[in-house]
Amino acid sequence: MTELLQLEKEVKKRKRMASEWAMQLHDLAEERLPAGFEELPQLAEATYKACQEWQRAVKALKAAQR
């Protein structure tokens, strides 16, 4: 598999993971707040980190495409 294909696959994987964390955060807001407020910091941090990892993967792909 070429480097570009690997990077594209990584971007898709990271996007899926970020979306999954975002969905968990959404579910918390829709279904368990305000009672589940103590879950908020952990879910927010995990979502933030997953989005950062996705962004890094996108940047790596763009750099490789140049």
Task: Report each predicted region and the residues it spans.
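Short, charge/polar-rich alpha-helical segments
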Residues: 1-15
